[in-house]
């Protein structure tokens, strides 16, 4: 019988991970499609742009933090007050080394559609098509453009998109989700109590990352996937 040391097993703790099932043709088909997109050379007329969105809690202080002193960090009371929720839209052009973050009060079809319109008309006005990588959230489709804009405008915007969806359980394939994690860790780890303050702090982070031209060097290829993720492929 195997014996475990005290505290070695912690059944009250869970770590969640999205695990695709074995021999999943749908997963590997969508995965290889994304990996093919990431393998394309940089083309200013057909930029590859990844997008993701998330919600973040606005948190206020019950008691003012005590400032840092020599030998002592800032002291923050463990009590807090919830101030609502803000939504984050993240757009990343990995090879171009630029991103755009927008903070909104909601994450509806309308909000997504306006984010896409701004992307196409303001940031990529000279591109023939934007190659857009994202997950298949129910708002992430051209129907949202028709919900937000007249048919002629919606069609025009839709025709400037080449959409590629990451597979279910494949969020790690979306570079924007990786960048969103960086944003949360570097900029949103502390308590922020209002959307205006969040917008200001995120804008400063966004500008700094773009000024540094921080690029993403994606190296995982289809060849790698067929070896390292062999169990996900149907067997013959």
Regions found by a protein language model. Give the residues of each.
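Charge-mixed, compositionally biased segments that are often intrinsically disordered regulatory tracts
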Residues: 1-82
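RNase H-like polynucleotidyl transferase catalytic core
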Residues: 74-80, 154-175, 191-194
